[in-house]
């Protein structure tokens, strides 16, 4: 079946083998909510080699600073993949066990996959490049305050970090599915101090919002009116 997978007109990630007899299936019963007369099998993760180009440390709304690997895009299981989360510092050192200084570097030849044909994943380093290594940050990439280690994760120590504020607002907007509130608009509002918490969205002034500079242009009254209306 695995050899015929690519020729199918639809995506599959495995197969299920079961009795072709309803009475036999029922007589075998279940275990943990799963029928004993059936077995599911998953295909191995599709993997391809590529070249690591960059690591960007992103600040989440909780203050967690997560490394994201960017690499030459490859086609995997029907999707084009060009980036993958590295999760934390410990995972970087695990992957870079045979690399100079125990760190990843630009030009490293890596193996990437899509776990369960969904999640991009950096599996291993095949050949380390003879280049400078990507360092582990000592300060937050957003507010430049010192970082702290909490378990396996690096955290920003500044409670008013702009990236944390904008991250919390973006999460709120996404959760409520508020239309026309893009990331660039939220970033601009947080950068100019108009919004410090999600609650501040509901106290925005129409004039101030209309005069907000976004991408080299002011937002304008009609757009400002529309985005404010979409809050309710």
Task: Provide a role label for each language-model segment.
Residues 1-232:
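RNA/tRNA-interacting regions in translation and RNA-turnover enzymes
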